[in-house]
């Protein structure tokens, strides 16, 4: 029987590449995005159906879930990919930005997971693959506290759910990625700024330089991330956590090699 994968955030970047990857390999794909009326690439495939979805909107999540199940009959794998990041001093962040960061990166996956649990229970199994970041297991850059918070929360959510859902044959997996090439990297970042407070200017200048450099190098080939998603979905990998990319693996090696105080001092010194 043909398997079906449900993916959030497929309008561009990693989400779109994942949808195309699975469609080309014979899977049915429920591809979701906030603006399906603007999509052209995915509509060329008969085994891809597009559903309107903003993961922050519980009613839209429920509607997209019900429609996907009605159209395909059974969903085997759900990929929580939709997400973005807020950077800048916490002092500058608007209340709306704080709420947005948590709503998109944490409440969004919660909404999708809760919507699919009755379906997975009815079919006595299923898999959630949550797209996290190495920034969900360690800190690597100043001014990323809100993004770190959201990804640390996603990691904790996924690990905590493992114990609830394992007895029901519902699997949970984490992909911990860095930025990827061709993923409109900076389009997925919101910067917190303040025109009057200058105390953070030097630090922000160094952080912005890192972001600018990331556009040219240090980003991973997104296909390596898609390949890991495919391995998890097909049983080729049984890992609970999959850390993808050179930067994340290098930082994790450093984090595991030294006490936390030494690690934090090392990262801070890179921006001194």
Kindly label every feature range from the protein language model.
Residues 133:
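Residue(s) in the substrate-gating loop at a strand-loop-helix junction
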Residues 53-63, 95:
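The beta1-alpha1 cofactor-binding region of Rossmann-like NAD(H)/NADP(H)-dependent oxidoreductases
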Residues 89-90, 97-100:
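Substrate-binding pocket helix/loop in short-chain dehydrogenase/reductase
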Residues 168-213:
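C-terminal beta-strand-loop-alpha-helix "lid" module of Rossmann-like NAD(P)-dependent dehydrogenases
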């Amino acid at each position: 029987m043909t398997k079906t994968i449900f993916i959030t955030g497929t309008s561009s970047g990693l989400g779109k590449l994942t949808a195309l990857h699975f469609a080309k390999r014979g899977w049915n794909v429920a591809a979701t995005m906030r603006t399906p009326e603007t999509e052209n690439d995915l509509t060329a495939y008969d085994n891809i159906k597009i559903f309107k979805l903003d993961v922050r909107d519980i009613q839209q999540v429920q509607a997209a879930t019900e429609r996907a199940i009605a159209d395909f009959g059974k969903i085997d794998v759900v990929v929580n990919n939709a997400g973005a990041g807020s950077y800048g001093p916490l002092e500058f962040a608007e209340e709306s930005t704080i709420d947005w960061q948590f709503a998109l990166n944490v409440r969004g996956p919660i909404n999708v997971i809760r919507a699919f649990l009755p379906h997975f229970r009815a079919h006595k199994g299923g898999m959630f693959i949550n797209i996290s970041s190495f920034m969900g297991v360690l800190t690597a850059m100043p001014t990323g506290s809100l993004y770190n918070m959201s990804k640390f929360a996603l990691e904790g959510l996924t690990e905590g759910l493992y114990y609830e859902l394992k007895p029901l044959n519902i699997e949970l997996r984490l992909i911990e990625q860095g930025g990827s090439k061709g993923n409109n990297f900076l389009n997925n970042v919101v910067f917190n700024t303040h025109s009057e407070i200058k105390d953070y200017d030097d630090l922000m200048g160094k952080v912005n330089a890192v972001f600018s450099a990331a556009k040219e190098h240090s980003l991973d080939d997104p296909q390596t991330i898609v390949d890991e998603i495919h391995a998890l979905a097909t049983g080729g990998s049984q890992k609970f956590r999959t850390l993808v990319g050179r930067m994340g693996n290098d930082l994790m090696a450093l984090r595991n090699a030294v006490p936390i105080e030494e690690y934090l001092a090392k990262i801070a010194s890179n921006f001194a």
